[in-house]
Structure formats: C-alpha cells, structure tokens
Amino acid sequence: MAKITKTFQYGKHTVTLETGEVARQASGAVIVKMDDTVLLVTAVAAKTAREGQDFFPLTVDYQEKFYAGGRIPGGFFKREGRATEKETLISRLIDRPIRPLFPEDYKNEVQIIATVMSMNPDIDGDIAALIGASAALSLAGTPFNGPIGAAKVGYKNGEYILNPTITELKDSQLELVVAGTANAVLMVESEAALLSEEVMLGAVTFGHREMQKVINIINELTVEAGTKPSTWVAPAKNTALISALKEAVGAQLAGAFQVRDKLQRRDAISAIKKDVLESLAGRVASEGWSSAELSKEFGELEYHTMRDSVLETKVRIDGRALDTVRPISVQAGVLPRTHGSALFTRGETQAIVVTTLGTARDGQVIDAVAGEYKENFLFHYNFPPYSVGECGRFGAPKRREIGHGRLAKRGVLAVMPSLEEFPYTIRVVSEITESNGSSSMASVCGSSLALMDAGVPVKAPVAGIAMGLVKEDDRFVVLSDILGDEDHLGDMDFKVAGTAEGVSALQMDIKIEGITEEIMKQALQQAKAGRLHILGEMSKALTTPRQELSDYAPRLLTIKIHPDKIREVIGKGGSTIQAITKETGTQIDIQDDGTIIIASVNAIAAQAAKSRIEQITSDVEPGRIYEGKVAKIMDFGAFVTILPGKDGLVHVSQISSERVEKVGDKLKEGDLVRVKVLEVDKQGRIRLSIKAVEEGEGVPASAE
C-alpha cells in the first residue's frame, strides 16, 4: 500500500495522519503528528478467537520513550521499564471509549500499542494517542463500530479552549478529555476549579462538536487506504437453549432481585443458576449445548430482569427510590497515631482513609520524558479482595486501582493548598474495606475528612457520587449512588465530585448510543442534589480543618538566609548540617534560594535547630563580645569558636594584660572564655581579644 497522508488543523495544532509506510505487518498502523509530538499507533487483531474464550481480550498499551524527549532513562538499567502511572492512565483513557464499540460476541484478541517517539514538552500525547488508536482500528478491518474522535477542552475567561497546551492548562479552570463517535459521547475525564454543572456540560458538547473533523478525516483515510469491511459474523443465537432456560428460570430471578442485601442476593442468584443448570444437564448432553453458552445466556436474563424491574417499578434492587443516597456514617480521627484519618461508610461501600504529612524531601521524584519533577501530593487507592468477600491476588496495584486513585485525587485537587501555603508533602491512602459500587467516590469523601482531620487547610469539604442510567428505547431512569450490580448492568457510569460551590472532577463512561444532552443534564442536576446531601452528612463529623496538627505530625519552621550563606550552614562535607540534625533530631531541607525548612515532631528541637542556623549565618561584628570555646592551642595563641563554624584567633599578646610566656599556662582546649572581636579582615579572618574584655571594652553579643 502506498503512503497516505491526511493533514488538518485542530485547535492551534496541525495534525497529520500517515499510514502505509511504517509497521505494515500490523493490522492497522498510523503515524500521528501533532506539531512536534509524534506517535506510532498500531492495532493488531487475531483472525480467530481462542478456544473457550468467554470475554473480549482487548489490550491497550501507551508508552513514552525517553528518546522522544532527547533523554536517557535514569536507574541502573538505563531503559524503559514497567509502565508509569501516566502511561497506565492514558492506556485506560484509550481503552474506555473503544471497548464498548466492539460487538458483544466478538472474542478475538485485539492489541493496541501507542508509542510516543517524539515529544514537544508543551503538547501531551493523550489526544494524539486516542486519535491514532481510532484510526488504526478503523484501518485494521475489525468489527469496530467507529471511528471515534477525541478532544481536550480548557476553560478560561468564560471561553472554551480546544486542545490547550500544557502551558495554557496551568491557568485554565478546566482540563477535560472527551471521546465519542459522530453521534454519541462515550467517555469524559476531567478535573475542574469548582465549575458549575452548566459549564461542565457545555465543555462536553463543545468537545464533541469539535471532534467531528477528526472522525471525518479518519473516514477519508480508511476510504483512500481501501480498507475492507470486517467479515466477522456474530454467532447465531441458540433459540432452543434460550427458550429452555427462560422456562426453567421462570420468575425466580425477579424474586432474587428483591433481596436487598448484596451478599444474600448474590447467593440467591448463584443458587438459582446452579439449580437451573442441573435441571438442564440432560438436554445439554442430548442436544450438544455448551455449558459456557448456557451461563452466558443466564447472565443475559439477569441483565434484562434487573433493568425491566427498575424501569417498570422505579424501585431499585436494594429498595431505594431512583434519587435516594444510601445511609451514610462518618467518623474522623479513627486511627490514633496517624496524622489524619477518617472512616466513611455509604451503604455497603466503606473506606478508611489516612493522611500523612511529610517534608518537601518526601515528595516523589518523577523521571518523565519531558524532564524530572517532584510531586508533593500523593493519592493511593487500594482495593483488597476481602472488600468484596473474595480471595484474590494481593500485591502491586492494578490498572483499575491506579485509575480510581487518580480520579479521587482529581476530586480533591481543586481545594488543596499550594506548597507555599502549606509546605508539606501530603500522602493520602484510601483503603477500601467494603465495596458495593462507587468506592472511588467514597475515597473522595473519606480523603476530604482525613485531610481536614490532619489540619490541612483545604478550601472546602469535597464529596463525590456515582450516577447510573438504565435506558430502553424512549424509557430511561437516572440512578443516584449506584450499586455494583447497577454499574455492571446499567448503561452509564457517571461520577461527579465537588464542593457545595461547584464541580472538581467528572468522569463518564457510556456503553450505548442515544445519551442526549438532556439526559446528561438531568444526571448532573441529580448528582448535585446527592452531593449536597452527602456534604451535609459529612459535616456531622467535621466542617473545617482542625486548627492544630497531630502530636505525631512534623512541625515545620521556615527561615530565610542569604544564598551565599548556604555553604556555611552545610559545612565542609556536610559536617555542620549533619551535626545540627543529629544533635537536635530534626530534618532540615535547604533550597537554592536560601529558604530553610526545619521539620520536627518536637517544637523545642525545631527551635533549637533554628537558633543554631541563625547563629551560623549571623555576621561577626567588630567590637562585640562573644562567649566562645577554646578549640585549639598554638604557640602563638589560641583559636576560639565564637559561633558554629566561626573560629577566631586570640594572639598570645591578647590573652592577658600580664605577660604570657606559654599559652597552655592560661588556656586549655574546651575552656569557655569571653572574647571581644577586634577585627574581621577581607579574607574573613577574625582577630579576638580576652584582654579587652577584662578591661571592660566592647558590647556583649547578647545585647542584640
């Protein structure tokens, strides 16, 4: 195939799609250029499904090569290793709008790899990767119901910005990524500076409108490339099996969905499934039916039973009305030795969230393609298997945990103080101890309480809520605070976090087409009512940050010295600073501009370290009297330490008004003596006198 190129203007950027020259053995491959940011995105689809495959094995890997930024990786091996958090998040960002566009019965393995090969540090690779994945899949000839487009939206001075640069995002009130087909929005990921629901919805519709040019260009590319439509055909339904299954189940599933407790409901459904499969075992054997297909169709019955019930009755499987939030229980300060903690329970979803305060040096150093930087606000989300009553793998975080942690972090970012306002590194850890839907939003609520319990001066409390949707033709219901089953069996997962003032984070995943602006508007308004209710429940535990830090949290003292004095504080080979930290038990961070931050759980120790540093950096004044310690005896006099790191010479003639034959007769090393500063010469050498003090000359240093 000859090389095909398509170029178009997208916001301020010139975007070019190329195919037919690179990675020609892949099912589909595209080079995406967005100014100087260049990605190779490939899609490979297996010709057939593996034997016994019962799920769609789609894998998405986004990777940033260090050579893209003209850098060599750090570390011993000097090569890229496991995926970074950013790479994992963008991989999920690509996966989410693509997965629902494949047919339900398609089980062939599909792998998408997006490689950043050149990076303009002001243009991120996320939108280019989404566009490239859509184009590569469209070229691959898979049964992909695309293409999709993608756009990033900023908001400043009341206007939306299409595909803002990283520089523009620094003072933007919004960073929102939206992806979708020509007719439907499928995915939204955003963080915002407490904007209204109307502004957020406007950003979604603006992005969807602008991305149409991407979809049109990809369609033109596939036509010019001569891509053949997929020949895959969905397997025919076994109508006899489905009829037999429906007859065997009868009204049992409808009854099971009336059980309000999650675990009891799950057990009831499992028992029905077991009985039904046993009752049909004879026909499975005689008619050659597949047990896997029988299980799949049982799942379809579950799906329709729950959906039909809520659409007909407007009552949910746990007995709630459509807009009712589950009972909430909140406690702050539940762990005595931590710096801040909270227990947040909403129905059968529960999180213990802990805040830890550290110094600037505790920040995480990120070795990124665009350059190294430090992250001083860390948010970690853990989802152990016991939270859903199961046994499972326990160890490094999975992609889902990284994604949920990032969403929860987005939820509270808008209210966090700057490092200048609160010079601590802050780590928040959310331990999900029970889960039945919306655990990421429980993490938002719990983290808000834990931060306030730790005394972090957040601007306002934050709460989060997950919304759902069930839609059949023109009938639909919007569900507040969804359960796990409602998420799994519904058509939309719509998470909103924010304060009473506005939205701080919005995440949306839609599984069907036909979600109108009106439906999204209703979901946002219903979410606002739920969020305000949750904030009211949270206020029963805490309404504002605590005035005092935990007794176990480090206290920070900040002082400023002239940058030229830094070497005096550090000392030769770090000797001075090491001595201060060892003797006072403090941790000291020195910045290039002369800012010194002293950290200690003990306030008295921090003050002692501060005094030592002030002594070291203070200037020695001629005419002043200091109390010092004899450091060294010489034939011609004695060296006396008058301040940490500052020694002066008392010449033998300045020891006493009487004649001194031998210095050792008058002074010993370690003696404490009062000395007057006679002179500080241009080289910084200090001349001292004991004799002048005895004669009553000079002003004591303490007089300062």
From Swiss-Prot:
Pfam families: KH_1, PNPase, RNase_PH, RNase_PH_C, S1
Subcellular location: Cytoplasm
Entry keywords, A to Z: Cytoplasm, Magnesium, Metal-binding, Nucleotidyltransferase, RNA-binding, Transferase
Membrane-spanning segments: none
Keyword Aminoacyl-tRNA synthetase on entry: no
Biological process, per Gene Ontology: mRNA catabolic process; RNA processing
Classification via PROSITE patterns: KH_TYPE_1 (PS50084), S1 (PS50126)
Domain KH: 554-613
Function according to Swiss-Prot or TrEMBL: Involved in mRNA degradation. Catalyzes the phosphorolysis of single-stranded polyribonucleotides processively in the 3'- to 5'-direction.
Assembly behavior: Component of the RNA degradosome, which is a multiprotein complex involved in RNA processing and mRNA degradation.
Protein name: Polyribonucleotide nucleotidyltransferase
Organism expressing this protein natively: Xanthomonas campestris pv. campestris (strain B100)
